[in-house]
Amino acid sequence: AGVKYRLAVPREGYRAWFGGLSLSRHAQGPVLDAAYAYLNWWLSGWPGAVMARQGYYIGNPARSRDHLSSAEWDYWYAGQPAREELLGSDGLPLIDIGEVRDGGSYEQRMGHIAVWNSVMDEHNYLVRRWGDFMRARST
């Protein structure tokens, strides 16, 4: 039993945010090697697939495609109806057959961003309200 909801698809455009990784100019030797290994892991595809199963995107989606089933790719990136039940990153059912992602395909969603933020002023408030919503959804 869950709460029925629908995400807003504002006519004016989405507000999006981006988090990135970078290296300190002071990193050297084994620390620098470990930092590059970590960055490369993020770009390897598997982390992006895990993120996709939570509804998020990664900067190099093509690398994630090999780690998603064709049904997952079609739902999360192509904007098509789910042709099978899809699991979330926790392995539990998340998307029902026939469900369509609000906002369309990756290209449609990315093409409709009006404002980019790094961290919104409302972030802490929204995280608390999202937690409230998720707790209500599970009862």
Q: Whereabouts are the PLM-identified features?
A:
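Short, surface-exposed loop/turn microsegments at beta-strand edges and helix-strand junctions
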Residues: R11-A16
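Conserved C-terminal helix/tail region of periplasmic/extracytoplasmic solute-binding proteins
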Residues: S89-T139
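Active-site lining segments that contact anionic ligands and/or coordinate catalytic metals
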Residues: K4, F18, D33
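Mature extracytoplasmic/periplasmic domains
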Residues: L21-R101
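Sec/Tat-exported extracytoplasmic proteins
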Residues: A1, W42-W46, G55, W130, ...
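Ligand-binding pocket segment of bilobal, Venus flytrap-like solute-binding proteins
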Residues: A1-P10
